[in-house]
Amino acid sequence: MTIQMNPYLNFNGNTEEAFNFYKSVFGGDFAVVMRFKDNPECGAMSEDDKERIMHIALPIDGGGMLMATDSLESLGQKLAVGNNFYISLSPETREGADRLFAGLSDGGKVEMQMTDMFWGYFGCFADKFGVQWMLNVGNNQPN
């Protein structure tokens, strides 16, 4: 089974600023920039929060990808140094994602069960050691 692993960072409303800085250092172009307003379910968010970064990805030479989001207090997310990153795994299949989710989350704290989102199949949790993980099978990957 092939699994892609990338760091996923959380910022306190300054993801765009941080990633423009990282882009100036690493070069290249953003693979994706998704704002909260792009989510069809953003609902009653403030206009400020709608403009925040929901997901951004910057390819790094060598095949890696640096990714991030803005943590929003309006969504109950409280950012603190130590919880400001996830390890993001992108297995090739839903079955692979389900297997990794079940194994790694055993004894941990599930933040979001594996579920279909508008961009793909996604779930996140902290394992029993407090390490935060995200699993994602994109819509363009096999089921």
Which functions belong to the PLM regions below?
Residues 1-115, 124-143:
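Glyoxalase I/VOC metalloenzyme domain signal
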Residues 118-120:
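Short, small/polar residue-rich loop motifs at catalytic or cofactor-binding pockets
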